[in-house]
Amino acid sequence: VGRFPPGWAEWNDKFRDTVRSYWKGDAGLLPDLAKRISGSGDLFNKRGRKPWASINFVTAHDGFNLNDLVSYNDKHNEANGEDNRDGHSNNHSWNHGVEGPTDDPEILELRERQKRNLLATVLLSHGTPMLLAGDEFGHTQNGNNNAYAQDNDINWPNWLGISARGRALREFTRRLIATRKAFPILYRSRFLIGSRNEELDVTDVSWLTPAATDMTIEQWQDGNARCFGMLLDGRAQESGIERRGS
C-alpha cells in the first residue's frame, strides 16, 4: 500500500484492519488509528500525493459485510460447496456475544452502535471513503465472507424490505455523508501533520486525552488507553482546503 505514483488512489487495507480491530476492542492501537483517520500520511505523504489517495473502507465485495462484521466471529461459507475452506479466516470481527442472528435486545443494540461507529470512522476520516452497497441498511450475507458464487439473496440487497433498524441506520449514514460534504475541513488537500500557524496560534490537528489535555508520548504508548480526541482547526492552513481535482 502506498507505492503507486501520484494520481492514483489505493484501497487502504491498513485502514480497514486497524479500524476493525480498534472497534473490536483490541489494545495498543491508538497511534496507528491516529495515522489512519488523519489520511495515512505514513503511507501516502510522498511524491506530491494527496490525502484522497487513501481509499478508506472497512468492508468491500470480498470478506464480511458490515452487518456480519459485528455479528460473526467466524466465516460460514458452507453454501459455497467448499466445506468452509474458502475465504479469509482473520476477519478482525466480533459477534458481541452470539454467533449470527439473535433476539437479545442488548446485543442487537450494541451491534447497531458498532455499525454506526464503523460508518462514522470511514466517512469522517481524511481520505476517500468507500462504502459497500447494502451496509447502509444492514444487509447480511449470513456469515459468508466469500460470496462470489451466490447469485441469490445472500448477495442481493433487499432494497424493498428494509427493517426499522435498517431505516434508522440508512438515515444515520445519510446524515454522515451530509456532514462530510458540509465541512471542507474533513477533506483537506494537505496531510494533517500537526503543523502550526504561528500568526494565528493554531495547529491543523491536535490530539487530546479524554481530559482535553495534549497527548504525551507516554499516553500514546499506553496499551491500556482506548480513546483520544482529534481537534481540527481550519484556520491553520486555509489555502490547503480544496476538493479533489481543484
Describe the role of every protein-language-model region.
Residues T121, W156, C227-L231:
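Conserved hydrophobic/aromatic beta-strand scaffold that supports enzyme active sites
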Residues S163-R190:
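Aromatic- and carboxylate-lined catalytic core of secreted/periplasmic carbohydrate-active enzymes
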Residues T213-Q237:
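Charged, flexible boundary elements
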Residues R49-P51, W220-R226, R243:
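A short catalytic or substrate-binding loop motif that flags glycine-/basic-rich loops and adjacent residues
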Residues V1-A133, F137, N146-Q150, P184-Y187, ...:
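Conserved alpha/beta catalytic core and glycan-binding cleft of carbohydrate-active enzymes
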Residues Y148-W159:
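Acyl/amide activation-and-transfer machinery of modular secondary-metabolite enzymes
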Residues T140:
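Short beta-strand/loop motif that positions the catalytic acidic residue
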